[in-house]
Every structure is written in structure tokens, then in C-alpha cells.
Amino acid sequence: MKDRLQELKQKTKEIELSRDGQVFVEEEQGVLVQQAVIYEREPVAERHLHEIQKLQENINSFVDDVQRFGQQQKSLVASMRRFSLLKRDSTIAKEIKIQAEHINRALGDVVKEVKKSEVENGPSSVVTRILKSQYAAMFRRFQQTMFLYNDTIALKQEKCKTFIVRQLEVAGKEVSEEEVNDMLHHGKWEVFNESLLTETSITKAQLSEIEQRHKELVNLENQVKDLRDLFIQISLLVEEQGESINSIEVMVNSTKDYVNNTKEKFGLAVKYKKRNPCRALCCCCCPRCGSK
């Protein structure tokens, strides 16, 4: 009987070659249907990221102005301040108010974008999560800066009141802090009457200094009144979104911890892989594996 095994092998090779050639021709002709990897559908976030970056720059500028204003108020000493300095402080306060209102409106727009993204893309989409985390971080920083500005104004008010009380005590007139607050509240500053010069040993220079402090207090009171509505809006936002902001902050912190732990584990895995004796033995025995 004739051995036809070699003939069978040759025929098998010819069939395989013909199949490969047919597949190659079909690919060249575009007959095969292309299969693409379809990722999760997410809208383009470049516009949102650009707006967020611009808002972050505005908040950074706002923080710098508030900190600069606070440093200037720390230099308040027990001496008469010129009217030009009071006018400059008033101008800075107006600029801070304009910045704060602008940032507050921009944060409100971000909240609207978050709600819109939740409806269109879902609460777990990448864009929605980015907007939420960025809003939480920016709002928290804006809130802390506003509290710092409020504390700065309150501290300046206390310094002015203390100065007035101390100057009147030196002049021989006892005035309590409650009386000063009442005078400020009702606007009855009878301590500036000319009769005070005859009743006490206060000089015109001391009276002029007290009047300057009075102007500062009135100016500060007006600044607080101007920002009252803004503080109310911030407090309402904190009540409405406080829990969500806290949960977002917790999630971001936990994600950072998880990423750090993962990096450490990857580093240990690479180190253990290099020290694996079996791998070293295989590399020596199998040069082809070692080259890989």
C-alpha cells in the first residue's frame, strides 16, 4: 500500500495558504466588517474644565485680596488715620464685594450644570462627578474666605470700639462697651458734642482721633450690611448641599488613600517579581524567556 501521509500534509498546507490568501484579499477589498471598541458615551468636558479653571483663578485672586486686606487691618495702631486711608479701605471693600458676588453667581451656574449633567448623562458619569468634586472644592474655599473676611471686619470693629473706650477713659469719661454698641446701633454719638471738651480734659486731637474711629465703625457697619445678603445665600447653600459636599470630600480623600495604597502595592509587586528565584531560574534555563 502506498504511503500518502506526505501528500495529505501538503494538501493541508495548500488549503491553509488558500484560506489565508482569501482572508487577505477580503481585508484589502473591505469585505470584512470592522469591529471597534466602544467606550462609555461621555460628552466632551473641555468647555466645563475651561470654565472651572477660570473660576478657580477668580477665587485665587479673591483669596489674595481678602488676605491682603486682613494684613492691612492688623497694622491698625492707636493713632489717628488719615481720611485717605479710610477711603482706600472702602474702595478695597467694594472690590471684594463685587468679586464675591461674581464668584457666587458663577458657583450657581456650576450647580445648574451639575443638575443638567445628571439629567443628560446620569449621576455616575465622568463629567457629573468632575463637576461635583470641583464645585465642592471651590465652594468650600470660597466659604472659608468669606468667613475670614467677616472675622477680619469683626476684629477691626472690636479694635475701634476698644480704642474709643480707652480714649474716653483717659479723658475721664466712663463709657462701657455696651454703650458704644448702642451708640453705633442707634447712631447717637453724643460723645462728639462740643460739650465734651468742657466736661472732660479731652483735647481736640483726641476728639479728632475718636471721630476717625467713629467713621471707621460706620464704614465697617455699612460693609457688613452690604454683604449680609451674600452671607445669607452662602448659609442657605451650606444647608442645602452641606451633606453632599461632605460626602464628596470624603470620597475624594478615600480615593487619594486608595490610589496611594495601590501605588505602594504595585511597587512591592515589581520588587518581589524581580527577586523571584523561579523567574531567575527560568531566565537562566530559557534564554528566550529571559530576553522577553
UniProtKB/Swiss-Prot annotation:
> Can you say where in the cell this protein is located?
Cell membrane; Cytoplasm
Q: Which UniProt keywords apply?
A: Cell membrane, Coiled coil, Cytoplasm, Membrane, Transport
The cellular component terms of Gene Ontology attached to this UniProt record, alphabetical and capped at eight, are:
cytoplasm; plasma membrane
Q: How does it sit in the membrane?
A: Peripheral membrane protein
Could you list the residue ranges forming a coiled coil in this record?
none
Q: Per its UniProt entry, which superkingdom is the organism in?
A: Eukaryota
Q: What single Pfam family name could you report for this chain, choosing any that match? A: Syntaxin
Q: Which Gene3D superfamilies match?
A: 1.20.5.110, 1.20.58.70
Main localization of the protein?
Answer: membrane
SMART domains reported for this sequence: t_SNARE
Expression by tissue, per the entry, reads: Expressed in stomach, lung and skin (at protein level). In stomach, strongly expressed in the mucosa of the fundus, in epithelial cells of gastric pits, and in gastric glands (at protein level). In skin, expressed in the epidermis, dermis, and epithelial layer of the hair bulb (at protein level).
**Domain (t-SNARE coiled-coil homology): residue spans on this chain:** 207-269
Q: Which GO terms describe its biological process?
A: intracellular protein transport; vesicle-mediated transport
Q: Could you tell me one molecular function GO term of this UniProt entry?
A: SNAP receptor activity
Q: Tell me which PROSITE patterns the record gives.
A: SYNTAXIN, T_SNARE
Subunit record text: Interacts with EGFR.
Job description of the protein = Plays a role in endosomal trafficking of the epidermal growth factor receptor (EGFR).
What family is this protein classified in? Belongs to the syntaxin family.
Which protein are we looking at? Syntaxin-19
Protein's organism: Mus musculus
Gene field: Stx19
